[in-house]
Regions:
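Active-site-adjacent structural elements that line small-molecule/cofactor binding pockets in enzymes
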Residues: 1-106
């Protein structure tokens, strides 16, 4: 999910949103790295705390638990696998894991 957070925080229009959540400096670093087309620096500029603030990641049990907590305050969610800066084969693995974790009956 680091790549997804990096992608969205690289968009200047979202900078105020990230700043309001306490991640303005990190968003600035990602925006600067994106301008240089430095993907590695973009990913490095996103700390773990930023990933966990804006995305759900972890083991299947951790993801289910976190999503269940989010449903307590959300009336809708869009859940998608990591897709930015991820190899296509890896994206397919993540997509399968997401379906198996959240959408298949136990």
């Amino acid at each position: 999910m680091r790549g997804t957070v990096a992608f969205y925080s690289s968009i200047a229009q979202y900078r105020k949103y990230y700043a309001a959540q306490g991640f303005g400096a990190q968003a600035d670093a990602v925006i600067a790295a994106a301008a240089r087309k430095d993907t590695a620096a973009m990913l490095k500029a996103v700390p773990d705390e930023m990933v966990t603030t804006f995305a759900v990641a972890g083991t299947p049990d951790e993801v289910r638990e976190r999503v269940a907590k989010l449903w307590q305050c959300a009336d809708s969610m869009t859940l998608s696998p990591p897709q930015y800066f991820v190899a296509p084969a890896r994206f397919n693995e993540y997509r399968t894991a997401l379906v198996e974790t959240l959408y298949q009956a136990a």
